[in-house]
């Protein structure tokens, strides 16, 4: 039996939330591989062992791509959000915002803005707080020249 890291519950919740917004439910295997690898690398930084991080991310991916109804998916996601303390809700939003900005080459179009708005609401972040996080992500993805 694998060792259970104390952060694993938070990692499961963060993965579920991030996947909801950045991973398509079907197809686009290259994009999915990139997202999964990024999440695993992030959780290694948090102190999880690689096999534990990969197991969590893959389990969340499998559930994300399952045939859950919209209501079941919403309830499942809400339970994940409720697990997270406020600082991890902010971190999850920052990870998503950085990914959205990076994927859109530092531009925030209507679709990207909608994703971030829905994520901020789901995570219960105030408008000023989510806007500040978005500003930081904008600076981080801005070209030097």
Q: What residues fall within each predicted segment?
A:
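Small-residue-enriched hydrophobic alpha-helices in membranes
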Residues: 1-145
């Amino acid at each position: 039996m694998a060792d259970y890291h104390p952060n694993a519950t938070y990692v499961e919740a963060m993965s579920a939330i991030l996947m909801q917004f950045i991973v398509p439910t079907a197809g686009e295997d290259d994009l999915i591989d990139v997202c999964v690898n990024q999440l695993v690398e992030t959780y290694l930084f948090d102190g999880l062992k690689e096999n534990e991080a990969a197991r969590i991310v893959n389990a969340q991916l499998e559930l994300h791509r399952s045939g859950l109804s919209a209501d079941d998916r919403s309830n499942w996601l809400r339970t994940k959000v409720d697990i997270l303390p406020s600082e991890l809700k902010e971190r999850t939003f920052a990870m998503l915002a950085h990914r959205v900005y990076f994927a859109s080459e530092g531009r925030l179009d209507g679709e990207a803005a909608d994703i971030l708005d829905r994520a901020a609401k789901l995570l219960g972040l105030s408008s000023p707080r989510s806007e500040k996080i978005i500003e930081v992500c904008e600076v981080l993805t801005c070209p030097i020249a």
